[in-house]
Amino acid sequence: MPSHSVLEIFDETLPVSIDLNLARMARLLRALGSPQRYMPPAVHVAGTNGKGSVIAFLRTILEEAGYTVHVYTSPHLVRYNERIRLGGQLIADQDLDSFLKTCIRLNRRRPITFFEITTAAAFLAFSQTPADVCLIETGLGGRLDATNLIERPALSILTPISIDHEFYLGPGLNRIAKEKAGILKRGRPAIVAKQMSASSRVLEWAARKKGVPLWRHGCEWKVSHRRFGSIFQSLSSRRILPLPGLMGLHQRDNAAVAVAALDFLDQF
């Protein structure tokens, strides 16, 4: 956990309410030397449902295959350290404290949100610790989320989108899908999970505007569920997926999204 002194500074600097705005985060990252440019290749995940589970499946598969993986997720359940994993381990207390203190010092007591300062600390930690890949979950929305200063992700993933956080993201599914699609970067590929038709139209429109190659559920890949597991099939492969440890049909869908992401990356 962060030290008492760090928590006291948090109380002094954090604004009262959430304010979706990239200006504060961009300013702090510049002061830190733009660590987002020096991180291992990033997989950036946005959506309404299943983000954490997709990242958990990706991490497990990659680590079992021998890769070193950094992870940034939220919220934490018990300990603040759960938000940042370095090379398969929760970030150590002393390292977390050091990275946070650096971010707080360079922020120079200017207003910044709890999530922004945490994201900056994660990016700084990732930039200074070798790994094969970073798995990064958005906090809220996509377009104006603090994580969205990643410039060239190896891959973006859009999990199922539904109505959420309308106060911050705007009313209606189209508006929310447009905000989530804000993580798409020009020319960088994206995996799209099963979506409602309204969300699909918005995501495909956003992808066309930015020249983003899409790997979509129901088009470039699909999955069918059986009692013994699931059958995953893409344009390039066919795989039998075992039942995941996490219960529920939705978790089998989440596992298939993770497999689709790795299947796509395996082509390049």
Regions found by a protein language model. Name each.
Residues 16-18, 22, 26-39, 64-151, ...:
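ATP-dependent carboxylate-amine ligase catalytic core
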